[in-house]
């Protein structure tokens, strides 16, 4: 539920995905 500061509208989460973030509602979130 915490925004990671990366969007995933056109491409998936990249850098933040390594930190455990996943795409939700076009934004990368963690918990």
Swiss-Prot record:
Lineage: Eukaryota, Viridiplantae, Streptophyta, Embryophyta, Tracheophyta
Known tissue expression: Expressed in seed, root and nodule but not in flower, stem, shoot, leaf and pod (at protein level).
Domain-related comment: The presence of a 'disulfide through disulfide knot' structurally defines this protein as a knottin.
Family note: Belongs to the cyclotide family. Bracelet subfamily.
Cross-link (Cyclopeptide (Gly-Asn)): 1-31
A Pfam family of this chain: Cyclotide
Reported modifications of this chain: Contains 3 disulfide bonds. This is a cyclic peptide.
Function (record text): Probably participates in a plant defense mechanism.
Native organism: Clitoria ternatea (Butterfly pea)
Record's signal peptide: none
Protein name: Cliotide T10
Disulfide bridges in this chain: 4-21, 8-23, 13-28
Domain of life: Eukaryota
UniProt-listed InterPro entries: Cyclotide, Cyclotide_bracelet_CS, Cyclotide_sf
Alphabetical UniProt keywords: Disulfide bond, Knottin, Plant defense
One GO term of the biological process aspect: defense response
């Amino acid at each position: 539920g915490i925004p990671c500061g990366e969007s995933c509208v056109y491409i998936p989460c990249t850098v933040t995905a390594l930190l455990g973030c996943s795409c939700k509602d076009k934004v990368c979130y963690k918990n």
